[in-house]
Curated annotation (Swiss-Prot):
Homodimer. Interacts with FtsZ. It comes from the Bacteria. It holds the Pfam family SepF. Keywords: Cell cycle, Cell division, Cytoplasm, Septation. Belongs to the SepF family. It is found in: Cytoplasm. GO terms for cellular component: cytoplasm. The lineage of its organism: Bacteria, Bacillati, Actinomycetota, Actinomycetes, Micrococcales. Signal peptide: none annotated. It comes from Tropheryma whipplei (strain Twist). One of its GO terms (biological process) is FtsZ-dependent cytokinesis. This is Cell division protein SepF.
Length: 123
């Protein structure tokens, strides 16, 4: 009975727990986060929509963790803006990135893809 009372008092903060902490056996090390192996990229999908309603092609590929290049040069400015808004939401929802490559061309990349750019140095 005294053991139960002691546990209740420790739980309520009215007493200190005097149990000794044991260190981990010498063969064990501290826990650490192991990085996930990077997936190999074997495909990039290039998409040339002519109207906004063709957006489902982007979704299917991006859900499969395939980077998508979207060339919106054939879209009206209104549809291009809608497509960018949709692609931005898609990339945020699936933890990806969206970057402008040039003009109306954008790269939608999944989380596991790292993009590096070369900055032009001013001379």
């Amino acid at each position: 009975m005294a053991g139960g009372l002691k546990k209740a008092m420790v739980y309520l903060g009215l007493a200190e727990d005097n149990q000794e902490l044991h260190s981990a056996p010498s063969g064990m090390s501290h826990l650490r986060r192991v990085p996930h192996p990077k997936q190999q990229m074997s495909e990039i999908f290039t998409f040339h929509p002519k109207k906004y309603s063709e957006v489902s092609g982007i979704v299917e590929r991006f859900r499969q963790n395939i980077p998508v290049i979207i060339d919106m040069s054939q879209l009206s400015d209104t549809d291009a803006r809608r497509m960018i808004d949709f692609a931005s939401g898609l990339s945020q929802g699936l933890v990806g990135k969206i970057e402008r490559v040039v003009g109306k061309v954008f790269l939608l990349s999944p989380e596991h893809i790292s993009i590096s750019t070369e900055s032009k140095k001013e001379e």
